[in-house]
């Protein structure tokens, strides 16, 4: 529309082109990109020396089902408190949730929460950890707290107990009761 400054562009099937826009771009609908494509931030004049990518090529939100287990024997999860939320932006995944059991089942020894929505990246820089924001029904020593760390190249977090004199030890099934529960929230790098 030459009189109002608007431009309509139609590109034929199979065509490839680049449009350069000097002003703002306003879109009334979704911007849909082909798989593996994204928003390129290559105009960054001074990227960090460790920069490995400038394309935002993934965004996703959803739910994940966590299970407290010793790796072989899952505890019975409370149906209302076994699902958490996640948001994935690029390769950074943020998960939250409250995980509540109704029975220990046959679990023994070190326990973990399985079911993370994406595999944690497989390198030492990908280790991540956190502390439980809330917990009930736990049989840990007074003054101790529950923490955790994500296992690289896997989809679970190790539960740990932090004590002033003992440091960090793997949380045992015996330190969790039938109605034990914790709330967690943390971010990790996906593989």
Question: Residue spans of the language-model regions?
Answer:
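Extended, loop-rich substrate-binding clefts of extracytoplasmic carbohydrate-active enzymes
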Residues: 59-88
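Surface-exposed coil/turn segments at beta-strand junctions on protein surfaces, enriched
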Residues: 2, 14-16, 88, 152, ...
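Short, surface-exposed charged micro-motifs
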Residues: 8-10, 30, 83-85, 147-149
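Extracellular jelly-roll beta-sandwich "head" domains, especially the C-terminal globular C1q domain
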Residues: 76-83, 98-191
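Phosphate-centric recognition/catalysis
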Residues: 93
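Intrinsic low-complexity, repeat-rich intrinsically disordered segments enriched
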Residues: 1-70, 96, 101-103
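Residues that flank catalytic or metal-binding motifs in active/ligand-binding sites
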Residues: 35, 52, 60, 82, ...
